């Protein structure tokens, strides 16, 4: 159930076609979880600053049942910062990503939970 959320001040018009699909496929590969369970939410046009400037930036979160931890998070950070840099032109030093290891009983889907 990985869910990746990107809040950014990058304009909607600058988000390339296929970016969400690319994030989905890359996260499926990185987490080892099926793409059918991965949700991606990109929220452009946000009023945001980072280091006191309005240059492109992003505040992100990755939620997952398992597959969250030290070495894994470093790999995700490298992957996701790379994609945000390549596709949205956001410098990696202007991105924060928070990681959340979710309890399966606390994640609802399809009328039930993952527990």
Swiss-Prot record:
Catalytic activity line of the entry: 3-phenylpyruvate = enol-phenylpyruvate; L-dopachrome = 5,6-dihydroxyindole-2-carboxylate
Give the enzyme class: isomerase
Q: Which residues carry this modification: N6-succinyllysine?
A: 78
Where is the catalytic site? 2 (proton acceptor)
In Pfam terms, one family for this protein is MIF
Q: Which UniProt keywords apply?
A: Acetylation, Cytokine, Cytoplasm, Immunity, Inflammatory response, Innate immunity, Isomerase, Secreted
EC identifiers of the protein: 5.3.2.1, 5.3.3.12
Q: Which GO molecular-function terms appear in the entry?
A: chemoattractant activity; cytokine activity; cytokine receptor binding; dopachrome isomerase activity; identical protein binding; phenylpyruvate tautomerase activity; protease binding
Modified residue annotations for N6-acetyllysine: 78
Entry keyword Isomerase? yes
Q: What is its subcellular localisation?
A: Secreted; Cytoplasm
Q: How does it assemble?
A: Homotrimer. Interacts with CD74 and CXCR2 extracellular domain and COPS5. Interacts with the USO1 and BNIPL.
The protein in question is named Macrophage migration inhibitory factor
Source organism per entry reads: Mus musculus
Give the gene symbol: Mif
């Amino acid at each position: 159930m990985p869910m990746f959320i990107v809040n950014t001040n990058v304009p909607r018009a600058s988000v390339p076609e296929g970016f969400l699909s690319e994030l989905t496929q890359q996260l499926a590969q990185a987490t080892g979880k099926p793409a059918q369970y991965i949700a991606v939410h990109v929220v452009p046009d946000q009023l945001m600053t980072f280091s006191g400037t309005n240059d492109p930036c992003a505040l992100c979160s990755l939620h997952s049942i398992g597959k969250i931890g030290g070495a894994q998070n470093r790999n995700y950070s490298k992957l996701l910062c790379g994609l945000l840099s390549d596709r949205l032109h956001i410098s990696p030093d202007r991105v924060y990503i928070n990681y959340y290891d979710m309890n399966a009983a606390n994640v609802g889907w399809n009328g039930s939970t993952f527990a």
